[in-house]
Regions:
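Strongly charged
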Residues: 1-94
Length: 94
């Protein structure tokens, strides 16, 4: 499902215009991104938590030059689904 499809579904279910739904969806995404950039988690009860996970420093290979490189410690965005959400998917996806 794409962002456009999500906006259409929200518009149909709530009766709001697509432009309003677009503003709401984009605002939600922006707030989640801003919070994660500041290393704050976003908890949505019954859905899950958006957070920044730390990746440790590690060694890797540059295959084009055949050299070893150091990949520094960094953060990546992550999503941890709520227990109830995982159960719903487990029991209903066919």
């Amino acid at each position: 499902m794409t962002k456009a499809e999500i906006i259409s579904k929200i518009s149909e279910k709530t009766g709001v215009e697509k432009t309003t739904a677009l503003v709401v969806v984009e605002s939600l995404m922006l707030e989640i991104k801003d919070s994660i950039r500041q290393n704050e988690s976003v908890f949505l009860r019954g859905f899950g938590t958006f957070l920044a996970r730390k990746r440790k420093e590690k060694t890797g290979r540059n295959i084009s030059k055949n050299t070893t490189i150091i990949i520094p410690e960094h953060h990546i965005p992550a999503f941890k689904p709520a227990k109830i959400f995982k159960e719903e998917v487990k029991n209903n996806v066919k």
